[in-house]
Amino acid sequence: MDMTLESCRKFVEVLASDAPAPGGGGAAALVGAIGTALGNMVGSLTVGKKKYAEVEAEIIALKAKCDALQTELLNQVVADDIGFVPLAKAYGIPKDDPNRDAILEEATITACAVPMHIMELCCEAIGYIKVFADKGSRLAVSDAGCGAVCCKAALQAASLNVFINTKSLKNREVAEQMNAKANGMLNTYCALADEIFNTVKAGFGQ
């Protein structure tokens, strides 16, 4: 089932159930898409305004990138579900099966791929939102701040879906490579999201 085609209420209802998907990864992707859309909205409210004519071309180009990014993040809701299937099947293999460990290892690495990609997309979104916050309509700057907060949350949530899998990998070299990549994104882009939030907040005298 493609949960992105369901209502918000249905998504939350299934998320709260014992269904295997959506889970944390799918939720992270959806929150990231919402955060990206909030930044994109600032662009929509900027284009066509005489006050922002000098940056209009840049904003239009940025909006096109966000359109694609929103779609890609929503696609990850389904991709995360699909990526988890091999791991779920691997855990069902009898423990005395000589191939179990190798199959489980491969499935665990596969399960890391989608949340890692969600992290990358959220980092990209936060970078775009910084531009919207700096150059977009002042009337909608709070939405840019909200978008940054959402994308930071999505980034952090996706990272946990990486770390829960790397923790169980037997190949520690591969695990540490993925951990280093994920932590690098967290360190850089959580800080940038915080900077956006604090700048927007300060603009309101807070």
Model-derived features: where do they sit?
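Short, hydrophobic/aliphatic alpha-helical segments
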Residues: 3-21
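Conserved phosphate/anionic-ligand binding catalytic regions in large, soluble enzymes, centered on
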Residues: 17-40, 140-158
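Amphipathic alpha-helix face/heptad-repeat signature
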Residues: 30-34, 62, 69-76, 107, ...
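Transmembrane signal-anchor/signal-peptide helices with a preference for the extracytoplasmic
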Residues: 41-53
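A structural-propensity feature for long, helix-poor, extended segments
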Residues: 50-89, 185
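Long, charge-rich low-complexity segments
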Residues: 79-91, 193-206
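Amphipathic alpha-helical interface segments
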Residues: 80-149, 153, 165
